[in-house]
């Protein structure tokens, strides 16, 4: 998931005069020697095709693409081979018992600069600092922010200070660091990358927690300068989850959020070890390989899909349906939000999607099948469109433009993001949570389960046909949903889940949730009400899908404990700490 928030955009915009400036294809003043892509390459990246129909009558499935090889070599950590649905992949397990290897992984690094204090910034800065202290390393973790900003004060409260040399100005921190973790908002990265690159030391390492910047550069025919390495470590969850599970796992050899890692360019042979060290220091239970391009496509797509936008659309659509059909508001909320974020998520997390179906009675299975059959292809239609909007660069441009609308310009007012939890449904949710017994996971409501699992399976199928690895597919479609994000909606509602995430994720959820709500209401639910027959081929394919075995393998690698989101959570975004139930 993207590792940024809009507060960082404000910090960068105040420090740079390049914000919102049209981007040129070359930068003579700083002589950064960008690699320019050929017109043929650019056209190839933007091409859109259609493929086989998967037996559907309305929607063609995405064309099948063969996964790229993601093998890697490390001289510091142990690489393990896993088999996921017949595909061999490689991972590195984490754990506090590996912290003593961090000095070797970070060889040649004296200072790690963490730029930004949004969703991921606080978590990553604190986790890295604490892990390096435990490893008895003298590497300095320094946070770079705009002086005088509210974020500067928040970083002080987290134990970083100018006096200790662990807090400073953005640009001096970039210039003085050997590894720079760029965790500002994606739109701020897109508007300020020229200045950022010019401040990096030669042979330093630029670390990203999202491949968005690569996607933006590709969309304008550019690549990174060749005088520094570029790596990525991308936690599969929001920043507050990364920190919370790290703290919870201190007594049990660590727990945290799984991460993907990628090496885009390596100027001196250190990049893989540094990336894996970064991931282990964050507390990742396991780390799997990807590329920056595959990461940004799956990540931006995933958060608009089942991770945030789609699940929001599902519960809005079903709550409205249930109440219109005579169900009480409280029960409708329990049978939508509480069901998905409680028992359904818990079951999928520990036993997989098939266990949800198998836990139902025979009548319950029929309700599940009816909902699944009617929802699968409408869900895929929007998911397919969303993926291709991301892959073509359209969604990336949308994020950049939205970030610029946060500020007054061209005589038009600023348009910050609005609230998403002020409707009747979410007020009902406050009442339901206020009387919910501790540990209550809600009812396993078959129809809701059928729609939710259909969305999850449709997302898996799109990513599979687009050539993503099973580890990436399962993390972006299943694990992040049930282990990192849904627990936050269970705790305090949809805004507490969505708005603890990055700016890119928050924008995408707001944009795409209504699309899923609409298509479910207009197509899936209408099909159910009209008595459309259950597509037994879809049900058979679901029951026998090889992804279930792959999920079981990944479940064995999940965090060693479940995330706890208490009422007085102090590890979330400050503006969300004092919200109501």
Curated annotation (Swiss-Prot):
Positions bound to NADP(+): 113-120, 146-151, 185-189
Domain of life: Eukaryota
Binding site residues for Mg(2+) 2: 299, 476, 480
Record has Cell division as a keyword: no
Reaction equation(s) it catalyzes: (2R)-2,3-dihydroxy-3-methylbutanoate + NADP(+) = (2S)-2-acetolactate + NADPH + H(+); (2R,3R)-2,3-dihydroxy-3-methylpentanoate + NADP(+) = (S)-2-ethyl-2-hydroxy-3-oxobutanoate + NADPH + H(+)
Cofactor list: Mg(2+)
UniProt family annotation: Belongs to the ketol-acid reductoisomerase family.
Protein name: Ketol-acid reductoisomerase, chloroplastic
Naturally occurring in which organism (per UniProt): Pisum sativum
């Amino acid at each position: 998931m993207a590792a940024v928030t809009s507060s960082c955009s404000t910090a960068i915009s105040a420090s740079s005069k390049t914000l919102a400036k049209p981007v040129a294809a070359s930068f003579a003043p700083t002589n950064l020697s960008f690699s320019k892509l050929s017109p043929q390459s650019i056209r190839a990246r933007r091409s859109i095709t259609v493929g086989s129909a998967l037996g559907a009558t309305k929607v063609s499935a995405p064309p099948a693409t063969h996964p790229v090889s993601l093998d890697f070599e490390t001289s510091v950590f142990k690489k393990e081979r896993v088999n996921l649905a017949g595909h061999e992949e490689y991972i590195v397990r984490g754990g506090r018992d590996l912290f003593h290897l961090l000095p070797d992984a970070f060889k040649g690094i004296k200072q790690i600069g963490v730029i930004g204090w949004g969703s991921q910034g606080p978590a990553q800065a604190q986790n890295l600092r604490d892990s390096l202290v435990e490893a008895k390393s003298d590497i300095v973790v320094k946070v770079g922010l705009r002086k005088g900003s509210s974020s500067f004060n928040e970083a002080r409260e987290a134990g970083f200070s100018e006096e200790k040399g662990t807090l400073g100005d953005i640009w001096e921190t970039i210039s003085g660091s050997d590894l720079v973790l760029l965790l500002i908002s994606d739109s701020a990265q897109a508007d300020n990358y020229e200045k950022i690159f010019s401040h990096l030391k030669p042979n330093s390492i630029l670390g990203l927690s999202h491949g968005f910047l690569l996607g933006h550069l590709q969309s304008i025919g550019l690549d990174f300068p060749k005088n520094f390495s570029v790596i990525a470590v991308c936690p599969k969850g929001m920043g507050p989850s990364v920190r919370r599970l790290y703290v919870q796992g201190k007594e049990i050899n660590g727990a945290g959020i799984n991460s993907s890692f990628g090496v885009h360019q390596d100027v001196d042979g250190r990049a893989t070890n540094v990336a894996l060290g970064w991931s282990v220091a964050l507390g990742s239970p396991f780390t799997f390989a990807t590329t920056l391009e595959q990461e940004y496509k799956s990540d931006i797509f995933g958060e608009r899909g089942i991770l945030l936008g789609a699940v929001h659309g599902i519960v809005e659509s079903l709550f409205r349906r249930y109440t219109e059909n005579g169900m009480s508001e409280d029960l409708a909320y329990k049978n939508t939000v509480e069901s998905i974020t409680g028992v359904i998520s818990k079951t999928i997390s520990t036993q997989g999607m098939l266990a949800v179906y198998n836990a139902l009675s025979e009548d319950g299975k029929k309700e599940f099948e009816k909902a699944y059959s009617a929802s699968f292809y409408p869900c895929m239609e929007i998911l397919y469109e969303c993926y291709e909007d991301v892959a073509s660069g359209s969604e990336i441009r949308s994020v950049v433009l939205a970030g610029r609308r946060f500020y007054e310009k061209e005589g038009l007012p600023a348009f910050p993001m609005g609230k998403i939890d002020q409707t009747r449904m979410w007020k009902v949710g406050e009442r339901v949570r206020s009387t919910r017994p501790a540990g209550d996971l809600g009812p396993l409501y078959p129809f809701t389960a059928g729609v939710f699992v259909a969305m999850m399976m449709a997302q898996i199928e799109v990513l599979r046909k687009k050539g993503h690895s099973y580890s990436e597919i399962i993390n972006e479609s299943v694990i992040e949903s049930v282990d990192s994000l849904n627990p936050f909606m269970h705790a305090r509602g949809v805004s507490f889940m969505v708005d603890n995430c990055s700016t890119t994720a928050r924008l995408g959820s707001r944009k795409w949730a209504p699309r899923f709500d609409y298509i479910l209401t207009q197509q899936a639910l209408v099909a159910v009400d009209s008595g459309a027959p259950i597509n037994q081929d879809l049900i058979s394919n679901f029951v026998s899908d090889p992804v279930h075995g792959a999920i079981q393998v990944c479940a064995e690698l999940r965090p060693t404990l479940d995330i706890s989101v208490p009422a007085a959570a102090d590890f979330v975004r400050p503006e969300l700490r004092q919200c109501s139930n």
